[in-house]
């Protein structure tokens, strides 16, 4: 067999350890700021995966509040995905610049529907010229039994408290407290509604200072699209809803079809960052950057629920893949996202030292309260369902496009590249993020890295044997109390 058939040895996270170095940096002093894509920053280098048991609006909101970003999955209609984008963008803001409004001809039922759909507690009422004429809150509707009653009969219109454009959050907070109200409409000189400030948003602004927000103070969110005939329609709808970035999400990003879609999207939506994946080689990375990708996503088969490597016989050990892609993109200013294979918090600094700017997590987030997976009880313990987007169940819901099987209508003929399982329930996301960030900070402290770029530039590895792996884990002892950030697997 020709020697050029073998490209060398491939390593993954368990095959290496980071080498400790002289340090003048304490873990609590390091900066975790990084990038999701060329123009989208991160305050922590953690991203939730575009999977239908991982990221919907609740997860995306929670991720952005912690400083990361969530990628909404595509297994839903275009409008459903856009609604979830708007839910994230409206969940909190310094000032909501496009608040949900209703005309004075609306009914109580219309207000109830909008409050439920967008998870909001108040709606400004405007006339045909967008002039503010009142506001209705959930307190106005709480005991209203006549759902067909006109909204103008229940809204607050007299002595309406408003502020002018340019009012600071500090001043707005004082006005809200003085008048004991929770919603403060912002109007122009001619009383045109231009925004809405809420007490809840002000509180979150000060309690979550690390939140990842856009220039308007809204939480950031990304959304996945596929190589499909309606991709431009989907991207346009998502863009109009306020999405911060698009992820063109396929199992094999180094392909002609992906290239065609990337060029179309970048040509029509020049202001929108486009992340493209998945890939695993230097050639693939160069290809995606040449066609306009604003970030690349690395990972062919490393995920815990992915069977691509054993079904198709194709893949690339994740650590080596990140290193190869990083070398290929050196000097390009294109961020690299390491997608899949993260089992322990220590794998995060390994991925970054290999060249990644951020990691994308699936299984480690699927057990949190904010994930959309079903909660189940098994043998007295609580779990949440978690499935690969290549599983038959997910492909039936729409992800078959990701594996280039979108022309197959007979579900029995689908060739899955993923499985369905369950993961232990972990509670609130912020508790898990605290452990992930703590492990990363510790790793950076050991390596003397004051920020993400320093870890990428100076991190060094040593390969270890199977004996080294055993030595790395607790051994020669029976664990009697589980740690919050470790479980044997």
Set out the residue ranges of the language-model regions.
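Alpha/beta catalytic cores of nucleotide-metabolism and tRNA/nucleoside-modifying enzymes
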Residues: 1-22, 102, 164, 171-174, ...
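Bateman/CBS regulatory modules and CBS-like beta-alpha motifs in cytosolic regions of diverse proteins
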Residues: 28-42, 49-51, 80-118, 125-127, ...
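Short beta-strand/loop segments at the ligand-binding rim of alpha/beta enzyme cores
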Residues: 41-48, 94-99, 214-224, 266-280, ...
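Catalytic cores of alpha/beta
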Residues: 58-61, 233-241, 274, 280-298, ...
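Glycine-rich phosphate-binding active-site loops on the catalytic face of alpha/beta enzymes
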Residues: 65-80, 189, 243-255, 294-312, ...
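Catalytic beta/alpha-barrel core
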Residues: 72-75, 101-102, 122-124, 162-163, ...
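Short beta->alpha transition motifs characteristic of CBS
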Residues: 72-77, 120, 124, 132-147, ...
């Amino acid at each position: 067999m020709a020697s050029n058939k073998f490209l060398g040895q491939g390593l993954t996270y368990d095959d290496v350890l980071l080498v400790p170095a002289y340090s003048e940096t304490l873990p609590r002093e390091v900066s975790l700021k990084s990038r999701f894509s060329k123009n989208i920053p991160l305050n922590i280098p953690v991203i939730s995966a575009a999977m239908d048991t991982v990221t919907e609006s609740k997860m995306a909101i929670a991720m952005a509040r912690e400083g990361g970003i969530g990628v909404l999955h595509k297994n839903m209609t275009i409008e459903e995905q856009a609604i979830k984008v708007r839910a994230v963008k409206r969940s909190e803001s310094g000032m909501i610049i496009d608040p949900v409004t209703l005309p004075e001809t609306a009914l109580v039922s219309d207000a109830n529907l909008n409050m439920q759909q967008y998870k909001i507690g108040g709606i400004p009422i405007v006339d045909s010229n967008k002039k503010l004429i009142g506001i209705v809150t959930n307190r106005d509707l709480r005991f209203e039994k006549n759902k067909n009653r006109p909204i103008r009969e229940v809204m607050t219109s007299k002595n309406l408290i408003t502020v002018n454009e340019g009012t600071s959050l500090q001043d707005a907070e004082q006005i809200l407290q003085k008048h004991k109200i929770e919603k403060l409409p912002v109007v122009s000189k001619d009383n045109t509604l231009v925004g809405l400030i809420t007490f809840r948003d002000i509180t979150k602004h000060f309690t979550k200072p690390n939140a990842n927000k856009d220039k308007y103070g809204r939480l950031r969110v990304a959304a996945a699209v596929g190589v499909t005939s309606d991709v431009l329609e989907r991207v346009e709808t998502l863009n109009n809803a306020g999405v911060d970035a698009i992820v063109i999400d396929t199992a094999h990003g180094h392909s002609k079809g992906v290239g065609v879609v990337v060029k179309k999207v970048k040509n029509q939506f020049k202001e929108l960052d486009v992340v493209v994946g998945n890939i695993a080689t230097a050639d693939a990375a160069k290809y995606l950057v040449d066609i306009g990708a604003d970030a690349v996503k690395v990972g062919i088969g490393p995920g815990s629920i992915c069977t691509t490597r054993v079904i198709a016989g194709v893949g690339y050990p994740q650590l080596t893949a990140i290193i190869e892609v990083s070398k290929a993109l050196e000097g390009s200013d294109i961020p690299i996202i390491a997608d899949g294979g993260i089992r322990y918090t220590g794998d995060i600094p390994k991925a970054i030292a290999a060249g990644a700017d951020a990691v994308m997590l699936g299984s480690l987030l699927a057990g949190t309260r904010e994930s959309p997976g079903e909660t189940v009880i098994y043998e007295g313990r609580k779990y949440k369902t978690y499935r690969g987007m290549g599983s038959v169940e997910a492909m039936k819901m729409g992800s078959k496009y990701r594996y280039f099987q979108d022309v197959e209508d007979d579900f029995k003929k689908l060739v899955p590249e993923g499985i369905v399982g369950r993961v232990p329930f972990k509670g609130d996301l912020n508790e898990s993020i605290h452990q992930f960030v703590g492990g990363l900070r510790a790793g950076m402290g050991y390596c003397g890295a004051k920020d993400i770029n320093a870890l990428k530039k100076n991190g060094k590895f040593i390969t270890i044997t199977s004996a080294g792996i055993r030595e790395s884990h607790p051994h020669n002892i029976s664990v009697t109390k589980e740690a919050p950030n470790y479980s044997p697997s």
